[in-house]
Amino acid sequence: MQENNINDLVASASRVIAPLWPIFTFAAHHPWMGLEKQSFEQVANWLKEARNVDIYPSASMIHSAKAKGEIEESFLQMSLSRWLDSQSFHIPREKAERFCQAALKLEKLPSSLLSSPEVNKLAEEMNYINTASMQASVMQPISSLIESQNSENLSDVLNYHIIKWCKLYLDESGSNWTMPNREKGFYRAWQHLITFDPALSKNERKVLKNWPQDAEVALARALSELGISESNIQSYLEGHLLSLPGWAGMIRWRSQQSIQEQELLIEYLAVRISMELAIVKPYLPLKNQKVEKKVSIVPLIASWIYWGNISTREWLQMPAAEQSELLAFAYRFDENIRRKLWLEAWEQTHAEQLREKIASTQRATNDKKRVLAQLAFCIDVRSEPFRRHLEKLGPFETFGIAGFFGLPIATSELGSNNNHPSLPVILKPKHQIKELTNENELKSYEQRKRVGSSVRYTFKTMKQNVMTSMALPELSGPLLGLQMVTRSFVPRGVGGFIRKLRKTMLQKPDTTFSLNHVHDTKGEIPIGFTKEEKVNYVRQALKIVGLTEKFAPLVVMCGHSSQSTNNPYAAALECGACGGAAGGFNARVFATLCNLPEVREALFAEGIKIPKDTIFAAAEHKTTVDELEWIYVPELSETAQEAFDCIESIMPNVSQHANRERLTQLPNFKTKIKNASKEAHRFAEDWSEIRPEWGLARNASFIIGQRELTQDCDLEGRAFLHNYDWKQDESGDILANIIAGPGTVAQWINLQYYASTVAPHYYGSGNKTTQTVTAGLGVMQGNASDLLPGLPWQSVMQSDSETYHSPLRLLIVIQAPSQYIERLLNNDFTFREKVQNGWVRLASVDPKGHWKNW
């Protein structure tokens, strides 16, 4: 096999896994992003066959949703009728409907019926029935087909070894003992050590002795010796990637970060399949490496007896052709189809409830009060309740925009030598922005910073050193024990004290930004912006939300951040549009750009007239405690000062209302809360708290339109809200950019929550309380599990038996005439594919308020 061919096959196979970002820069991703050319239904069926993974909501989730009024029976009947209309069958429609109605109750077939001698005898007598068309062939890793003498599946043995080697190579925690020859790449480092691995038997090490030094050659040789034909190689590689999707996803992400590691996924598969050969060689050759999943007709007959109300006597009296038709129909109307129809009914119910809510609260666009301040928030669903309460309590107008404010920047905070790409992970930064201050202030700040850093560094060094780690528990035990007790039993007081101490010690001096373009910089990313770029980014963001006239005296750009303690998933609660970081930096940079005279003059020449007394400021919305923290307030005009004072005066009430609404949704908060803000701070500071906030759980829709469309709507913190005025977008470019950027981020977030809810054992990350942070990369259950790719149980579940997140595919609602939607679908093939294949849902609201499902 040629090397180019194996490279192409690995690239094609990689579609079955998604890149996995390190947990401390957590970026939402949906696990099927490489499979969107297939329909959601096709992927669901394939995963069920290949990995026995269900990606439709379970029967218990569906029954619970129906009991809560989240699913209307009429929509289920409509879905069933559509499905029956799409099928070709030769049994009476009434009989088929009766069978389907009974099966849709999602009851399990009684085990007594399945094991009944009478039913099994019927099945034996029907051996003439041809079930070949019902069978599915799945290419499984050979190791998964073999059990050792200890009754241990060899795929588990293989996974144990691969996890060990992945941890060694990928370790980012700064271990003192690193993997030898790591700089030569994963495969070469593994090859250097594998023949000394005591965990392998002598015969297994012998197989790998003198193994090829080149990863591509080794992979091709291993596949050849395993007897995998060229036509089955891609399917075989996919099976191996799906065996440990977390570690494979991390490998794939790393391969995309640098040229030096671009072949890392090939190296991973070379290591994995070479080790598989060594482990399974004593059992070769196998008679049949392709697993034929034979269809048992026992449950098909039992389903007609139980749901079709057919007796065994009636079955025996049927002609063979009729029996075949009934079996084929029962096979087609399988559990996946039944749950698919329920999911569609659930989604249609949600869409209808949202339509009614929007229609009942729409107000005339000319019914406007005097606006004292305008505040732009991230589209994040957690902004919706905060915006709603803010608008109710004061003369304010709010906007929704992606929380990076359209700035493709990498941020470098004061005193830091590193930068963070503060934009959606689907984009690459084009500018580096540094936080600056004068030299004396910088030295003083860095000295204070070094004190804390040196303590942490000393502790880490002692922990990782063989000798000092023995003494560390005795030395640090009393202090850490005291910290554990105080942070668990008096979290708010201790947390507040630590925050004040940190603020005093690490109080930043007044800072500016490197906004002006620096020529001939050594880094890959240029520092600052040219004048044209400054104007372009400001114009673009103002136009995208429709804020090009009627500016209020104070315009506040609000990034957002979360606040939690002892939480490995802290980055998952930060701003997704800022790559898993707080959005305050971007908000401050954007507000600063808007205040520059050169920017305002250029915008004025283009017809965007920002009044002289309009001032842009920046703040950060703390989502865990629903507070607004000011991070940039320049000198204010008289009217802007009035607006600022008004915001300050009502903010405690806004926080109380928003916190009360949010906290009552948490488990164990059914009683009345006396002081919601204090309770929220306790959750944020308690390091034993496994659920400081719900994050983006229950997200279900992405609404693109003017604020009037949803103003006064209680959207329950379930909607991403992005401002959009179609009247200012004749070309449709603004809408296309919203769909391609924020729309994609929202879809990824939505499907990550979906996957973590419906398949928590495979796409989630299990129970937070039993997780281990591993190699500075992510979490595992214990020390020998997959690198867990999704969200923890506590992010999507109310209890062990009740979900909190409703697993619905994202509904994108666009306020625009139908021709805008048609143009978008015609021009954007990727988005059209997502809609057609069921990865997102799409609806529109035209200028007359008419709702249309696409």
Swiss-Prot record:
Primary localization: membrane
Highest rank taxon of the organism: Bacteria
Coiled coil spans: none
Single GO MF descriptor: zinc ion binding
Binding residues annotated for Zn(2+), in chain numbering: C378, D380, H560, C575
Cellular compartments per GO CC: plasma membrane
Function: Part of an energy-coupled inorganic carbon pump.
Record-stated family: Belongs to the inorganic carbon transporter (TC 9.A.2) DabA family.
Name of the protein in question: Probable inorganic carbon transporter subunit DabA
Organism name: Bacillus cereus (strain ATCC 14579 / DSM 31 / CCUG 7414 / JCM 2152 / NBRC 15305 / NCIMB 9373 / NCTC 2599 / NRRL B-3711)
